[in-house]
C-alpha cells in the first residue's frame, strides 16, 4: 500500500463515515484526511479543515434530563485501541450497533489500519490521537474531542506499557517514570478532565472503566509472583518519580524494576477507580468499575519480555493453568463491563473464571486501602497539574 503524506503535522482524529472511504476530521485548521478508493490500493493523507462527522446510526436511550428517548448511539472512548484487548473491545462494542467507538491511540495510522483489518464497519468508529506519555497530549485530546461535538457516555482507560526486563527507567515527556506515567498519571488526568463530559451525558448508564490486573492484586497466586507489587508509603511518587537524586519507583526503592513498576501502576489504577467511586458516584450516578478480563497470554503487552517467556507462556496458560483467554473473548468481557445493563454496580472489580459469568472479585488489602487511595489521589493531582 503506497502512502502519500501532504501535511507534516500530528494527526488528531479520524472517522469513517461510509464504507470504503476514510476521512479524518477534527475542528482545527490542519487535520489529516485519509481516503481509500476501492480500485486502487493506495492511501492518501491530506490536510483538510472540516467539521467532525456526526455519530453514526442511532440507538435508543432514555434521557436523564427530560425522560424522553435519546435516539443516538452511545459514544465510548477507549485508550490503546489499536491492538490487543483495546482493539478487541472496540470491535465487540462496534458490532453491537449500539456504540460509536473513539479509538484514542498514540499511533494514528496504525489504529486506522487495525480497525479496517479487524473488519470494523465504516462509520462505527473514530480514531483520535492520544499520547498518554505527554500530559499536553492528554489535554489536547480532550480539547479535540470536545470540538468534535460528540457526547461522552463511557470512558475506558485501557492502554498500558509493560517493560518487565528493564533495569533502568525511561521517562515521559513530563519527566515521570514511563510505566506509572502512562498507565496511571496519563489516565488519571484524562479521567479527571473527561469526568465533566460524562456528567453532561444524557445516556442512561454512564461508565468510567479502568483496567486492573491480577498481577497487582497480592491476594492471588499470580499477584505473589516476584517482584510483588507494593506502593509502600508512596515516597517515590511524592518525590516525582524522577530517578535523578530520587527514586523512579513509587515505594522509593533505590533500584529500578520494570516488572514491579508495571504492577505498582495497576494498584494505582484499582485504587483510583475506588476513589472516583467514593467521590463522585453518589453525586453523579456514574458507574466506576475496574476489571481483570483474564490472562491474554498472546497479547502484545508481553512484546518486551524475554523470547523464552513469550514462547512458553501461552501454552502454559492454555494447558496447565487453564487460564488462557483469547483477545476476542477478553474484548467481549470488557465490552460487557462497558455496556451490559446488569453490570451497573459502581466501585466493583469484575473478574471471570474459565467459562464463568462475571463476578465481583475481592481486591487485596493494599489495592482497596481508602487512606492510600486518598493519598495517591492528592499526589497525582499535583503531579498532573490539577492543583
From Swiss-Prot:
Q: Which Pfam families match?
A: adh_short
Chief localisation class? plastid
Entry's localization field: Plastid, Chloroplast
Q: Name one GO cellular component term.
A: chloroplast
In terms of superkingdom, the source organism counts as Eukaryota
**Transit peptide, UniProt annotation:** 1-35
Enzyme Commission number(s):
1.3.1.33
- Cite the entry's keywords alphabetically: Chlorophyll biosynthesis, Chloroplast, NADP, Oxidoreductase, Photosynthesis, Plastid, Transit peptide
Q: Name one GO molecular function term.
A: protochlorophyllide reductase activity
Task: From the UniProt record, give the pathway where this protein acts.
Answer: Porphyrin-containing compound metabolism; chlorophyll biosynthesis
Tell me the InterPro entries matching this sequence. NAD(P)-bd_dom_sf, Prochl_reduct, SDR_fam
Q: Which reaction does it catalyse?
A: chlorophyllide a + NADP(+) = protochlorophyllide a + NADPH + H(+)
Gene Ontology biological-process annotations: chlorophyll biosynthetic process; photosynthesis
Its biological purpose = Phototransformation of protochlorophyllide (Pchlide) to chlorophyllide (Chlide).
Q: Report the sequence similarity comment from the record.
A: Belongs to the short-chain dehydrogenases/reductases (SDR) family. POR subfamily.
What is the name listed in the Swiss-Prot or TrEMBL entry for this protein?
Answer: Protochlorophyllide reductase A, chloroplastic
Species, as recorded: Oryza sativa subsp. japonica
